[in-house]
């Protein structure tokens, strides 16, 4: 459960006892899996900002669609949808905010970079890199601290304004991965509603999934 393995042991004439030991390999694998999924989303967003736009390809009308073959419609739609988020300030701001959020320390736990998880060069944007040795050492030393730093969730979550004192306190008590994914999900949902992309946006589905 969350990288913690429960082991039941029974000695002669002794009632069963439950010993809880951290499954360190499972914790590492969970973190690695999350980082890989997160990086995939970030790279998709970065690609969308740089994607070429074909301004001459306007959305087809119903009449125009009927005059074209299924293949022609598909190719036209791909061109029309390409570059919708090219140089989009909102997406760029989301990526910038996510990168900044990665540096924020978690109250009562630690910071992402103490665990050997970094963003590398600025050109890499918010893409994460793992120092395997440093992360495994951190897990071996204090697995609960690692889990809290990344996945901690406040006991009583409220919908406070982000910049209010309550909102800042709640954010400070939320694990880095949890709050970053919340920021990404909220930002992409806002873009989808604003641009009319809808809930079928591929990036939005990746975040929600």
Task: Show the residue positions of the predicted features.
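Acidic, low-complexity proline/glycine-rich segments
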Residues: 1-14
């Amino acid at each position: 459960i969350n990288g913690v393995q429960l082991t039941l042991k029974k000695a002669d004439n002794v009632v069963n006892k439950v010993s809880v030991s951290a499954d360190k390999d499972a914790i590492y694998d969970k973190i690695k899996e999350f980082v890989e999924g997160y990086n995939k989303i970030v790279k998709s967003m970065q690609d969308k900002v740089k994607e070429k736009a074909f301004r001459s390809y306007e959305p087809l009308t119903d009449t125009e669609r009927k005059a074209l073959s299924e293949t022609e419609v598909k190719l036209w739609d791909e061109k029309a949808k390409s570059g919708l988020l090219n140089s989009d300030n909102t997406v760029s701001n989301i990526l910038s905010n996510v990168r900044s959020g990665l540096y924020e320390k978690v109250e009562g736990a630690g910071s992402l970079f103490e665990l050997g998880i970094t963003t590398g060069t600025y050109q890499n944007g918010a893409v994460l890199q793992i120092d395997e040795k440093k992360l495994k050492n951190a897990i071996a030393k204090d697995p609960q601290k690692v889990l809290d730093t990344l996945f901690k969730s406040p006991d009583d979550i409220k919908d406070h304004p982000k910049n209010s004192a309550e909102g800042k306190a709640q954010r400070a008590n939320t694990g880095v991965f949890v709050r970053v994914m919340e920021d990404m999900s909220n930002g992409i949902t806002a873009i989808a509603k604003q641009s009319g992309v809808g809930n079928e946006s591929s990036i939005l589905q990746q975040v929600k999934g």
